[in-house]
From Swiss-Prot:
Mitochondrial intermembrane chaperone that participates in the import and insertion of some multi-pass transmembrane proteins into the mitochondrial inner membrane. Also required for the transfer of beta-barrel precursors from the TOM complex to the sorting and assembly machinery (SAM complex) of the outer membrane. Acts as a chaperone-like protein that protects the hydrophobic precursors from aggregation and guide them through the mitochondrial intermembrane space. It is found in: Mitochondrion inner membrane; Mitochondrion intermembrane space. It is a peripheral membrane protein. It comes from the Eukaryota. Changing residue 61 to S: Abolishes import into mitochondrion. SUPFAM superfamilies: Tim10-like. The keyword Plastid does not apply. This is Mitochondrial import inner membrane translocase subunit TIM13. The keyword Membrane applies. Changing residue 73 to S: Abolishes import into mitochondrion.
Length: 105
């Protein structure tokens, strides 16, 4: 028994086989962790969107307290932000899917 076997350094063919097996075997814990991270990122993105919308729209639209024109301005600003967010999200998802399909990711 050599030192390489003690420290996990078996033959190169054994290392390749172990690495290939590890990559191809689906790990339910890893999958669950990826799902949890994806959910947390989605919540963080939604929170960031709400914060930016609130900050920008209210700063732009609230010129005087309780003015009726504030409501229309805020509604239009929110709609604009949501349309922009949807366009950007679709483009981002498309790029990620294309990169994943071509093996870049």
């Amino acid at each position: 028994m050599g030192l390489s076997s003690i420290f996990g350094g078996g033959a190169p063919s054994q290392q390749k086989e172990a690495a290939t097996t590890a990559k191809t075997t689906p790990n339910p814990i890893a999958k669950e962790l990826k799902n949890q991270i994806a959910q947390e990122l989605a919540v963080a993105n939604a929170t960031e969107l709400v914060n930016k919308i609130s900050e920008n729209c209210f700063e732009k639209c609230l010129t005087s307290p309780y003015a009726t024109r504030n409501d229309a301005c805020i509604d239009q600003c929110l709609a604009k932000y949501m349309r922009s967010w949807n366009v950007i999200s679709k483009a981002y998802i498309s790029r990620i899917q294309n990169a994943s399909a071509s093996g870049e990711i």
